[in-house]
Every structure is written in C-alpha cells, then in structure tokens.
C-alpha cells in the first residue's frame, strides 16, 4: 500500500470491523506483534475499531484510537472495552470509546436489516448509530491525518 503513488505514507489510518478491529488494535499497539508491524516506510497515524474483541487486546495503543461499540453487543461486549481502556490508564495518545445505546454487533452494516443470529450472537443494523459513527469517524480522521 505504501508504494502506491496515491498513498501518502504519513497520512494512513487503520480501520477495522469485528475481527478486523482486533487487527486494528494490534497494529495500534506501541509494541505490535511482528505479524502486524507495517513496513518501515508506513506508519499508522490513527486507528478506528468497530466492535472489536477488546478482551484480546494487549497493549495500550501508541496512536490516537477510536472504538465504536453497541451497548447491546453480545459478541464483543462493550464492558470488555470499558474495562480494557481503564486498565491502560491515561498515559499516551487518546483512546476514545463510543458506546451506542440500543445497538448490536454489526450496527454499521445496512445489509443486517432485518437483524439475524450468527454463531449464537445477534447482529443488526442501526441507522442512527451508523450515521453517527460515520460522522465521528470522519471527524476523527480529519483531526489526526491532516
């Protein structure tokens, strides 16, 4: 990606959803696991994770990080993110958690309307949460990439 002529390697953010959000949190760590270390000519400046499995996150992010999660998410519970962020303390770049009341896992995806069960977990689109998350994601990226 960093070799592409249309990519400014100094203005790249990691954004992921669910399991991809775990990868996002992993690349955001100061001492990222070798598998997730970007090439030397690419440095992530910010990270945004939608409904990540926060319980699996290890180190505190070393870049500004924004986490979106639904209060009713039974796959990646919001409480796990709240607890993980509290355990990291306040030293370092900001880590912000946005919890959407009434929202489930997958709230960002319109194709999850109507909602459905997958692997014993409820997934459902929530237009209000998705619109707000989209707006806040753009604000976050503008703030940290420009």
Where are these regions (language model features)?
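Acidic catalytic loop of the alpha/beta-hydrolase fold
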Residues: 72-77, 105
């Amino acid at each position: 990606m960093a070799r592409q002529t249309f990519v400014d390697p100094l203005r790249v953010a990691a954004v992921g959803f669910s399991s991809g959000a775990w990868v996002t949190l992993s690349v955001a760590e100061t001492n990222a696991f070798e598998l997730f270390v970007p090439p030397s000519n690419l440095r992530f400046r910010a990270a945004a994770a939608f409904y990540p499995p926060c319980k699996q996150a290890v180190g505190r992010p070393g870049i500004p990080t924004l986490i979106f999660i639904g209060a009713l998410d039974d796959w990646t519970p919001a409480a796990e993110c709240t607890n993980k962020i509290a355990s990291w303390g306040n030293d370092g770049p900001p880590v912000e958690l946005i919890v959407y009341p009434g929202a489930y896992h997958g709230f960002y995806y319109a194709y999850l309307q109507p909602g459905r069960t997958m692997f014993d977990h409820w997934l459902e689109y929530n237009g209000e949460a998705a619109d707000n998350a989209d707006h806040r994601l753009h604000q976050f990226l503008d703030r940290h990439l420009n």
